[in-house]
Protein backbone atom coordinates (compact mmCIF):
# COMPACT_ATOMS: atom_id res chain seq x y z
CA UNK A 1 0.00 0.00 0.00
CA UNK A 2 1.61 3.25 -1.17
CA UNK A 3 0.12 6.67 -0.44
CA UNK A 4 1.34 9.14 -3.07
CA UNK A 5 -0.46 12.31 -1.98
CA UNK A 6 -3.09 13.67 0.36
CA UNK A 7 -5.09 16.91 0.29
CA UNK A 8 -6.79 18.22 3.42
CA UNK A 9 -9.42 20.96 3.45
CA UNK A 10 -11.00 22.54 6.55
CA UNK A 11 -9.72 19.93 9.02
CA UNK A 12 -8.69 21.84 12.15
CA UNK A 13 -5.48 23.81 11.45
CA UNK A 14 -5.36 22.56 7.85
CA UNK A 15 -7.65 24.93 5.98
CA UNK A 16 -6.02 24.01 2.69
CA UNK A 17 -2.99 21.72 2.74
CA UNK A 18 -1.40 19.14 0.48
CA UNK A 19 1.42 16.62 0.85
CA UNK A 20 2.58 15.35 -2.55
CA UNK A 21 5.16 12.82 -3.74
CA UNK A 22 5.18 11.13 -0.33
CA UNK A 23 8.07 8.61 -0.10
CA UNK A 24 7.81 5.19 1.51
CA UNK A 25 9.30 6.66 4.67
CA UNK A 26 8.77 10.31 5.54
CA UNK A 27 9.74 12.49 8.50
CA UNK A 28 7.61 15.51 9.41
CA UNK A 29 9.32 18.21 11.48
CA UNK A 30 7.88 21.37 12.98
CA UNK A 31 7.40 23.49 16.07
CA UNK A 32 4.68 22.78 18.60
CA UNK A 33 1.28 23.78 17.28
CA UNK A 34 2.15 23.52 13.57
CA UNK A 35 -0.12 20.52 12.99
CA UNK A 36 2.09 17.42 13.09
CA UNK A 37 -0.28 15.47 15.35
CA UNK A 38 -3.32 16.82 13.49
CA UNK A 39 -1.87 15.60 10.18
CA UNK A 40 -1.61 12.04 11.47
CA UNK A 41 -5.00 12.31 13.15
CA UNK A 42 -6.53 12.56 9.67
CA UNK A 43 -6.05 8.81 9.38
CA UNK A 44 -7.39 8.32 12.89
CA UNK A 45 -10.45 10.32 11.87
CA UNK A 46 -10.93 8.19 8.74
CA UNK A 47 -10.49 5.09 10.88
CA UNK A 48 -13.33 6.20 13.16
CA UNK A 49 -15.52 7.12 10.17
CA UNK A 50 -14.98 3.67 8.71
CA UNK A 51 -15.39 1.80 11.98
CA UNK A 52 -18.69 3.53 12.86
CA UNK A 53 -19.81 6.68 11.03
CA UNK A 54 -18.87 10.32 10.49
CA UNK A 55 -20.98 11.59 13.41
CA UNK A 56 -19.20 9.25 15.79
CA UNK A 57 -15.80 10.33 14.45
CA UNK A 58 -16.67 14.02 14.86
CA UNK A 59 -18.14 13.53 18.35
CA UNK A 60 -14.92 11.85 19.44
CA UNK A 61 -13.13 15.11 18.58
CA UNK A 62 -15.62 17.51 20.16
CA UNK A 63 -18.10 17.75 17.29
CA UNK A 64 -18.18 19.47 13.92
CA UNK A 65 -17.52 22.95 15.35
CA UNK A 66 -14.28 21.76 16.96
CA UNK A 67 -13.05 20.02 13.82
CA UNK A 68 -13.92 22.54 11.09
CA UNK A 69 -11.18 25.13 10.47
CA UNK A 70 -11.72 28.39 12.33
CA UNK A 71 -13.81 30.88 10.38
CA UNK A 72 -15.20 28.25 8.00
CA UNK A 73 -18.34 27.08 9.80
CA UNK A 74 -20.94 25.76 7.39
CA UNK A 75 -18.35 24.55 4.90
CA UNK A 76 -17.37 20.95 4.21
CA UNK A 77 -14.41 19.03 5.60
CA UNK A 78 -12.76 17.17 2.74
CA UNK A 79 -9.89 14.84 1.91
CA UNK A 80 -8.40 13.55 -1.34
CA UNK A 81 -6.03 10.60 -1.03
CA UNK A 82 -4.17 9.09 -3.99
CA UNK A 83 -2.62 5.67 -3.50
CA UNK A 84 -1.55 2.43 -5.16
CA UNK A 85 -2.06 -1.04 -3.63
CA UNK A 86 1.49 -1.79 -4.91
CA UNK A 87 4.07 -0.17 -7.21
CA UNK A 88 2.82 -1.70 -10.46
CA UNK A 89 -0.90 -1.22 -9.86
CA UNK A 90 -3.20 1.60 -11.01
CA UNK A 91 -3.44 4.91 -9.18
CA UNK A 92 -6.57 5.02 -7.00
CA UNK A 93 -8.15 8.29 -5.91
CA UNK A 94 -10.41 8.42 -2.85
CA UNK A 95 -12.37 11.62 -2.23
CA UNK A 96 -14.44 12.31 0.88
CA UNK A 97 -16.38 15.43 1.88
CA UNK A 98 -18.30 15.77 5.13
CA UNK A 99 -20.75 18.55 5.93
CA UNK A 100 -23.97 19.37 7.76
CA UNK A 101 -27.50 18.72 6.49
CA UNK A 102 -30.53 20.95 7.11
CA UNK A 103 -30.82 19.48 10.63
CA UNK A 104 -27.17 20.29 11.44
CA UNK A 105 -26.32 16.61 11.43
CA UNK A 106 -23.09 15.50 9.78
CA UNK A 107 -23.47 13.54 6.55
CA UNK A 108 -21.21 12.33 3.77
CA UNK A 109 -21.69 15.08 1.19
CA UNK A 110 -19.49 13.40 -1.40
CA UNK A 111 -17.58 10.11 -1.61
CA UNK A 112 -15.85 9.02 -4.80
CA UNK A 113 -13.49 6.19 -5.68
CA UNK A 114 -11.93 6.20 -9.12
CA UNK A 115 -8.95 4.49 -10.69
CA UNK A 116 -6.77 5.24 -13.68
CA UNK A 117 -4.72 2.77 -15.71
CA UNK A 118 -2.03 4.56 -17.68
CA UNK A 119 -1.58 8.29 -18.26
CA UNK A 120 -4.33 8.77 -20.84
CA UNK A 121 -8.05 8.25 -20.90
CA UNK A 122 -10.84 8.99 -18.47
CA UNK A 123 -10.67 7.35 -15.03
CA UNK A 124 -13.06 4.53 -14.13
CA UNK A 125 -15.59 5.57 -11.52
CA UNK A 126 -15.87 2.77 -8.97
CA UNK A 127 -18.45 4.54 -6.82
CA UNK A 128 -19.90 8.01 -6.33
CA UNK A 129 -22.19 8.75 -3.38
CA UNK A 130 -23.79 11.80 -1.79
CA UNK A 131 -25.92 11.82 1.37
CA UNK A 132 -26.37 8.05 1.33
CA UNK A 133 -27.43 7.75 -2.32
CA UNK A 134 -25.28 7.10 -5.36
CA UNK A 135 -24.06 4.75 -8.05
CA UNK A 136 -21.53 1.94 -7.75
CA UNK A 137 -20.09 -0.87 -9.81
CA UNK A 138 -22.26 -3.95 -9.32
CA UNK A 139 -21.46 -7.67 -9.24
CA UNK A 140 -18.51 -9.80 -8.11
CA UNK A 141 -15.60 -7.36 -7.97
CA UNK A 142 -12.08 -8.64 -7.39
CA UNK A 143 -9.89 -7.50 -10.28
CA UNK A 144 -9.65 -4.14 -12.06
CA UNK A 145 -11.27 -5.45 -15.23
CA UNK A 146 -14.26 -6.55 -13.14
CA UNK A 147 -14.84 -2.89 -12.32
CA UNK A 148 -14.25 -1.71 -15.88
CA UNK A 149 -16.85 -4.14 -17.26
CA UNK A 150 -19.33 -3.91 -14.39
CA UNK A 151 -22.70 -2.26 -14.70
CA UNK A 152 -23.22 0.87 -12.59
CA UNK A 153 -26.40 0.85 -10.53
CA UNK A 154 -28.00 3.32 -8.16
CA UNK A 155 -27.90 2.21 -4.53
CA UNK A 156 -28.88 3.56 -1.12
CA UNK A 157 -26.95 3.18 2.12
CA UNK A 158 -28.55 2.54 5.51
CA UNK A 159 -27.66 6.04 6.67
CA UNK A 160 -26.20 9.19 5.04
CA UNK A 161 -23.37 9.31 7.60
CA UNK A 162 -21.94 5.89 6.65
CA UNK A 163 -19.03 5.53 4.22
CA UNK A 164 -19.97 3.70 1.02
CA UNK A 165 -16.70 1.72 1.07
CA UNK A 166 -17.98 0.24 4.32
CA UNK A 167 -21.67 -0.08 3.52
CA UNK A 168 -21.43 -1.79 0.12
CA UNK A 169 -20.64 -5.49 0.46
CA UNK A 170 -19.52 -6.04 -3.15
CA UNK A 171 -16.26 -4.16 -2.48
CA UNK A 172 -14.96 -6.26 0.41
CA UNK A 173 -12.76 -8.38 -1.91
CA UNK A 174 -11.91 -5.71 -4.50
CA UNK A 175 -8.16 -5.18 -4.23
CA UNK A 176 -8.22 -1.38 -4.56
CA UNK A 177 -10.73 -0.77 -1.78
CA UNK A 178 -9.75 -3.68 0.48
CA UNK A 179 -6.14 -2.41 0.56
CA UNK A 180 -7.26 1.10 1.47
CA UNK A 181 -9.68 -0.19 4.10
CA UNK A 182 -6.97 -2.34 5.67
CA UNK A 183 -4.64 0.67 5.88
CA UNK A 184 -7.30 2.82 7.55
CA UNK A 185 -8.57 0.06 9.85
CA UNK A 186 -5.05 -0.84 11.05
CA UNK A 187 -3.87 2.77 11.40
CA UNK A 188 -2.70 4.06 14.77
CA UNK A 189 -0.30 6.72 16.05
CA UNK A 190 2.50 5.49 18.28
CA UNK A 191 3.34 7.34 21.48
CA UNK A 192 6.70 5.72 22.17
CA UNK A 193 7.63 5.90 25.86
CA UNK A 194 11.24 5.17 26.77
CA UNK A 195 10.36 4.03 30.31
CA UNK A 196 7.89 1.49 28.93
CA UNK A 197 10.42 0.32 26.32
CA UNK A 198 12.91 -0.55 29.08
CA UNK A 199 10.55 -3.16 30.52
CA UNK A 200 11.28 -6.82 29.79
CA UNK A 201 8.39 -9.11 28.86
CA UNK A 202 10.02 -12.42 28.09
CA UNK A 203 6.83 -14.52 28.15
CA UNK A 204 5.01 -12.56 25.45
CA UNK A 205 5.18 -12.78 21.66
CA UNK A 206 5.20 -9.88 19.25
CA UNK A 207 6.22 -9.14 15.66
CA UNK A 208 5.36 -5.44 15.73
CA UNK A 209 5.91 -2.67 18.26
CA UNK A 210 2.91 -1.62 20.32
CA UNK A 211 1.75 1.99 20.50
CA UNK A 212 3.85 2.76 23.59
CA UNK A 213 6.80 0.49 22.80
CA UNK A 214 6.59 -1.55 25.99
CA UNK A 215 7.10 -4.77 23.97
CA UNK A 216 10.43 -3.61 22.48
CA UNK A 217 12.38 -6.48 24.05
CA UNK A 218 9.86 -9.02 22.72
CA UNK A 219 10.02 -7.66 19.16
CA UNK A 220 13.83 -7.51 19.37
CA UNK A 221 13.91 -11.17 20.34
CA UNK A 222 11.58 -12.04 17.46
CA UNK A 223 13.80 -10.26 14.92
CA UNK A 224 16.95 -11.88 16.37
CA UNK A 225 15.49 -15.39 16.14
CA UNK A 226 13.58 -15.14 12.85
CA UNK A 227 15.46 -12.51 10.84
CA UNK A 228 19.11 -12.63 11.99
CA UNK A 229 20.41 -10.77 8.91
CA UNK A 230 18.06 -7.85 9.63
CA UNK A 231 19.04 -7.92 13.31
CA UNK A 232 22.74 -7.68 12.41
CA UNK A 233 22.00 -4.77 10.05
CA UNK A 234 20.18 -2.96 12.88
CA UNK A 235 23.12 -3.52 15.24
CA UNK A 236 25.54 -2.29 12.55
CA UNK A 237 23.60 0.95 12.06
CA UNK A 238 23.27 1.47 15.81
CA UNK A 239 27.06 1.21 16.16
CA UNK A 240 27.43 3.92 13.52
CA UNK A 241 25.05 6.28 15.29
CA UNK A 242 25.27 5.47 19.00
CA UNK A 243 28.69 5.59 20.70
CA UNK A 244 29.50 2.58 22.87
CA UNK A 245 27.10 0.08 21.24
Question: Which role fits each region the language model picked out?
Answer:
Residues 88-236, 240-241:
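Electropositive, glycine-dotted interaction segments
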Residues 1-78:
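Pre-Walker A-like glycine/lysine-rich segment at the N-terminus of P-loop NTPase domains
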Residues 69-79, 210-219:
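Short, charged low-complexity intrinsically disordered segments located at boundaries
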